[in-house]
């Protein structure tokens, strides 16, 4: 069979009508992408740009004064604001506790839901319940669960012979209750993401491992976990970003109390913009939270590229 050779042809040597056809294809691609690009700009780019712009102004609706350009004063004021540092630390701490907690709990639930048994669908259906519940509704439910007099948690403790805990009067216990609620609420998302990854692992790999005499633990660490890496990383990125923006559950359970011990950065932004109507400082806080989320995403992506 004769060998085929590839000949590179200069675009200038092609007929003019073929060059116009190629230009038409490019123009068509631009026209098809234009609506999505415009919509993305209206939904994301413009609000972020407007947020950054407003953060350089002193804009308080309660003062009745017009907006005044003050440069970076809103940002420098954060360094002298103890509540900013406390709420930022609370947000970081919630992220460090709830993201790994939801990951381990979600991994266990996904492995359980992936087991081959006859009643598999109720297990998988139950994973959707926490995920489908609105965050504010979950906060209200667990606020009742942890209620000192009528809560289910204290009722169980009393039946076991322990004294009930006044959960929301103590900063530490209130913080623990919020973290437990967030882990319960978000572990189902982790489980669904990991379960989707488990479904893509070829069964032949496990059969080959059985032939080689590999045990369950070895199969998990050498087959399951490495192949789940893409699903886990995507879930971690989404979950970390949402953890840094935690608002609904602590707002509904404690309102940020006692004091500001459970107030998150998102709640502090809401307080400044909605309660105090200080749009300038609130916008600066929101820019910091946005930058923090982008930094975390960049770190995750850098880790992925380094390991690959």
From Swiss-Prot:
Keyword Cell membrane recorded: yes
Major subcellular site: membrane
Bilayer topology: Multi-pass membrane protein
Limits of the ABC transmembrane type-1 domain: 88-300
Cell location: Cell inner membrane
Keyword set includes Transmembrane: yes
InterPro entries with a match to the protein in the record: MetI-like, MetI-like_sf, UgpAE/MalFG_permease
Alphabetical list of Pfam families matching this protein: BPD_transp_1
Coiled coil segments of this chain: none
GO biological process, one term: transmembrane transport
Taxonomy, superkingdom: Bacteria
Residue ranges of the TM segments: 28-48, 92-112, 126-146, 164-184, 223-243, 279-299
GO CC aspect terms: plasma membrane
SUPFAM superfamilies in UniProt: MetI-like
Keywords attached to this entry: Cell inner membrane, Cell membrane, Membrane, Sugar transport, Transmembrane, Transmembrane helix, Transport
CDD domains: TM_PBP2 (cd06261)
Subunit field text: The complex is probably composed of two ATP-binding proteins (SmoE), two transmembrane proteins (SmoG and SmoH) and a solute-binding protein (SmoF).
Functional note: Part of the ABC transporter complex SmoEFGH involved in sulfoquinovosyl glycerol (SQGro) uptake. Responsible for the translocation of the substrate across the membrane.
Similarity-based family: Belongs to the binding-protein-dependent transport system permease family.
Protein name stated in the entry: Sulfoquinovosyl glycerol transport system permease protein SmoG
Gene symbol of the encoding locus: smoG
